[in-house]
Amino acid sequence: MSLIDFSLQCGRLWKNAGKSADQIQTESIAAFRRMLEHAWKNTRFYPAFWGRSGICYEDLRVIEPGDIPCITKEDVRKNYADFSTVSLRKDRTGEWIPKKKAAVIHSSGSTGIPLQFLYSRRAMTMVEANFVRLSNLGGKKRVGWRDLPIRNIHAASVGEGYASALLLTDGLSRYHAKCIVLNASEPLAEWVEKTGDFCPNFLSGYPSCLAMLLDLQKEGKIDLHPLKVITGGEPLKEDLKMEFEKCFDADVIDYYGCCESLMVGAGSSWYQGMYLFDDMNYAEVDDKGHLILTPLYNPLFPLIRYRLDDLVEGFSRTGRGELPFTHIDRILGRDEDILWFRNEDGNPDFLHPLVLDDLNVKGLTSYQFIQKNDELFYVDCIMESSDPAIEGEIRRQLDEMLRRKKMQNIHYEIIHRSRLQRNPKSGKIPLTIRQKESGR
């Protein structure tokens, strides 16, 4: 049953990629309305929540999506059992678990208390089928029958229960795929040993973890020739994407997903920006640029107009370009990634991650901004050498950033590091960290 359903979903999703943008949008809004009716009939939360805004069942067929109130992670946390369409019970730790089989995805907790999201087996199959579509939608390397079963090396920094780990252990294994997991907590020598003579046709993981494999490849310690390099979980910088493509001679796919919707969209090495898959989610943006999602493939735990913390730029439904789906230029970051200071006039002002990410200095490998107080931040830097010219150029660019923002009152310190800080919960390396000191 599972393999048959998987094949059918692969075919359906592949066919959608050949439709027009108008067809895709018409089908997406129709699926959105079906999900509205399903949520009303099968959950306790939505009839009460929408009713408080004067929305009744008859309105669901005609109401504009923007007239339906958004929900947030906090709404899900406070009303968890009322979102589920299947019976739940609490385990010994007090966590809700489904009485019928379902996949449980944990949020990392990097933006608050961790939360679980439930997925049906069919929903997981849809996500897995979309990865097949994603792999062959373009690029210079095709995945053919002779490449099956898939052989993958995954460079990981988080444990079980997270989306990537679950897709690997539960997804790939069901289709007899072979996977080696390299954990960021292991010595690099162990990575080399575990890789051995394994010949993967896929590499996957956070960009920061895959960059370690890239270094090992450059040093001649491993020799990998994958067809596809799939990244996700962290922003993928253009120069690193180009290095992956060149060094591994592979197509690069920048996968975008989250615990609320495991498959949102993807960027790649063969087109600019990122496409959002409208046959998986109905996507919107609010006036501040927050992405609002309604997953269309997971009726077990319906999330209707769920507002993410992610900020996006260049949202467009026109379908111009390689694919007929909604397109965004880039993900700007999250609200909590923005660093707030006091400017020269004593008023609150911010440094946005998008501005900070413009720091481009030859010899500067990677960097991280750490806010210490309202007038001080550190820049932790990994540099190719101790050449003072590198630090001099960093200072020149930072001074210009602060001058343009009228924040020349802000002080900073450049600190040479051998490694950057990871978020202990998510395993990601954030660009910005708030680490304010008391009494400063």
Name these PLM-found stretches.
Residues 1-106, 113-133, 139-145, 197, ...:
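Nucleotide 5′-phosphate-binding alpha/beta core
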Residues 39, 107, 203, 257, ...:
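Residue-level signal for inorganic ion chemistry
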Residues 105, 242, 356:
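Active-site phosphate/pyrophosphate- and oxyanion-stabilizing loops and adjacent acidic/basic residues
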Residues 122-131, 151-209:
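AMP-binding/adenylate-forming
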Residues 183-186, 190, 200-241, 254-260:
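Adenylate-forming
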Residues 203, 300, 305-406:
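AMP-binding/adenylate-forming catalytic core of the ANL superfamily
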Residues 227, 236-319:
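Conserved AMP-binding/adenylate-forming
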